[in-house]
Amino acid sequence: MPARGIRKAPDRSKRDAGRDPLRRVPVIAVDANGADLGPAEVADGATFAAQQGVRVLLFGPAAELGNAGPAIEVIDAPISIAKHANPAASARAHPEASIVRAALAVANGEADALVSGGSTGAALAASLFNIKRDRGILRPALAAMVPVPGAPVTLVDVGANTEVRAEHLVQFAFMGAALAQVVHGLPRPRVALLSVGEEASRGTQIVLDVHERLSAASELNFVGNIEGHALTEGRADVVVTDGFTGNVALKIMEGVSKKMIELLRETANSTKRAQVGGVLMKPALLAVRDEIHPEVAGGAYLLGLRKIGVLGHGRFKARGFEQAILLAARAVNGDVVGCTHDALERAGALRKARTVSESGSTVSAS
């Protein structure tokens, strides 16, 4: 099969203006399998990211990944477990799978971070079995940046743990706060607990227990409970919840945002007068679309491991995978793993290593 051509990178000078340059050259292991648009789209994203100073180890079917540039090394790994029903069993049974080999490269020190746009369950399983949890971490967690214009909100967990205990959510709060400090430069991010009411007495027993523990944590800027409608109102910088609730909330917001853009487009073309107004409003509407588009966020951080991971959306195009790789690179340069561990250690929220089993985390496919 002839090698495919790589698309020319678009001009991103305006979009990337003001972003912090990558301080060193991190190496990112990227799983090219599992994306809805195929490995070629991931390869294009890797090419765009490499042009911004990142080295990439690209794991996938070499025949579909094209001619790699000087900063990209293609590792032929055509086997995918992204669609397998049991991610944990598949990750153990298929060590040659692309996601497993990418995670192993991170564990062995060949790469600094992992990026995948395939199955969440497969990426979690491969990461837990190879990269492993950081010392004292009970459960890894997925932290997504909710694309609120001008003020991204870190939502954690968004799918790694469908069932949790109070101590898990306490650790998630500290991990999310450390991430917000590094990524957004917030010296003391406001942390809130997602619940069915703002009062301290509202919520499940787990939420009540977590509220009490976070209120007593002087190291944390805990601002209390927050309801779902307030996620985008700027009341908190970090919102903590279990993976089931967080995943549902995130996907509802993504769906509503997408539908609103579609309705605006349809309305702007509905009449001659609307078309004139649409032309005048087009620059502003495009700016809003770009601000809230999931691809701009770049995916979710996988926190609590010995190395950082970023899980992109399977529907991402090249632009989204580029952002996912750049997210991972900036997390490496910002030492998110070290900052998270230090924050938990200072707060006394780490468990002794002997009390943490390697198989204690819930792995859920999505």
Residue ranges and their predicted role:
Residues D112, G118-H168, F172, A178:
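Glycine/threonine-rich beta-strand-loop-alpha-helix active-site module
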Residues L128-L155, R235-V239, G243-G360, S366:
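Glycine-rich phosphate/nucleotide-binding loop
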Residues D31, F59-G60, I75, S116-G118, ...:
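Short beta-strand segments
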Residues P2-E64:
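N-terminal phosphate-binding or glycine-rich loops at protein starts, especially the Walker A/P-loop
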Residues A40-E41, G53, L57-A63, N67, ...:
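Glycine-rich phosphate/diphosphate-binding loop of Rossmann-like nucleotide-binding domains
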